[in-house]
């Protein structure tokens, strides 16, 4: 079979090709092949009950009528995923504007000024809301940002901790479960141990080099972590805070009470859930 023509590559085999293939496997037709390979008891005996053909417009109306039968309920999923209000100007000029994700490569500065400006605005907003001096241009989501925080804090252990082999991260039990799952998965191959518990009751042992807390936590509680952060720093531990970035418009930014890393998801800032994505994670540090 020749593949040098687009029609051959994309339309499929010719009748002659089909006959050669059938002869090779010892059958005379596709019907005989199906009879020999698909059990009769699972095959449909009667023709498909299809309605009359519709135009594209009629089909659109039909599907809309079917969709209108769905019952819409308020989503209480939480845990880092929330319904949002997306400003119309953002929806039209960003989400529905393919220029943002189709034109050129983002690494050519001379043709990506708009994208570079958007990234600078993103980083500036993250720094302003978290109270931190540095922010990157986003990560995949909150859970992977947490894993990056652990890797970073592990690499930044003081020399005495490195010599003693300190390899424990304390994760508060009110951290989102998906965050804990991803952090645990990423920690295992690095030889990092994960310990969970209540932040206000845990004792930070000498082998603990970092802590992670949620703000507000998975139960929606707004905890005052100041004393815990001071305790962790006194023990030589760094503290990463998983923060709801929208709440930071009202709450005291973690950077103002001593957090070393602040991370989370920016889905809260107006990105629709899109059946589970996309959601850019943010990451800020000092």
Task: Give the label of every model feature segment.
Residues 114, 144-286:
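Conserved PLP-enzyme active-site core in the AAT-like
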Residues 27-38, 42:
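N-terminal glycine-rich anion-binding loops that anchor highly charged ligand groups
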Residues 18-19, 31, 123:
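Generic structural marker for isolated residues within well-ordered, non-membrane alpha-helices
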Residues 38-121, 127:
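N-terminal entrance/gating region of PLP-dependent enzymes' catalytic architecture
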Residues 107-111, 115, 128-148:
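Short loop-beta-helix segment that forms the pyridoxal 5′-phosphate
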Residues 22-23, 34-35, 127, 187, ...:
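Residue-level preference for well-ordered alpha-helical positions
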Residues 1-13, 17-21:
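Charged, compositionally biased N-terminal leader segments and the immediate start
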Residues 97-109, 127-132, 163-166, 194, ...:
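Gly-rich Lys/Arg/Thr-decorated short loops/hinges at beta-loop-alpha junctions or inter-strand turns
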């Amino acid at each position: 079979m020749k593949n040098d023509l687009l029609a051959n590559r994309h339309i499929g085999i010719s009748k002659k090709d089909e006959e050669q293939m059938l002869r090779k496997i010892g059958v005379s037709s596709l019907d005989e092949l199906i009879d020999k390979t698909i059990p009769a008891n699972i095959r449909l005996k009667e023709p498909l009950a299809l309605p009359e053909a519709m135009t594209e417009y009629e089909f659109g109306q039909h599907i809309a009528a079917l969709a209108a039968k769905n019952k819409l309920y308020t989503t209480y999923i939480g845990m880092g995923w929330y319904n949002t209000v997306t400003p119309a100007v953002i929806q039209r000029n960003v989400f529905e504007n393919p220029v943002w994700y189709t034109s050129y490569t983002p690494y050519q500065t001379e043709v990506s000024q708009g994208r570079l400006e958007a990234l600078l605005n993103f980083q500036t907003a993250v720094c302003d809301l978290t109270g931190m001096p540095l922010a990157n241009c986003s990560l995949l989501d909150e859970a992977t940002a947490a894993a990056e925080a652990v890797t970073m804090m592990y690499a930044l252990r003081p020399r005495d901790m490195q010599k003693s082999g300190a390899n424990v991260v304390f994760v508060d039990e009110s951290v989102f479960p998906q965050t804990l799952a991803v952090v645990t998965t990423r920690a295992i191959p690095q030889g990092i141990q994960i310990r969970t518990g209540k932040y206000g009751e845990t004792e930070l042992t000498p082998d603990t080099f970092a802590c992670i807390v949620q703000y507000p936590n998975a139960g929606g509680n707004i905890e005052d972590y100041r004393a815990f952060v001071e305790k962790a720093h006194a023990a030589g531990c760094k503290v990463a805070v998983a923060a709801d970035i929208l709440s930071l418009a009202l709450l005291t930014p973690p950077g103002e009470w001593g957090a070393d890393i602040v991370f989370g998801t920016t889905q809260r800032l107006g990105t629709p859930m899109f059946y589970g994505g996309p959601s850019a994670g943010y990451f800020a540090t000092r």
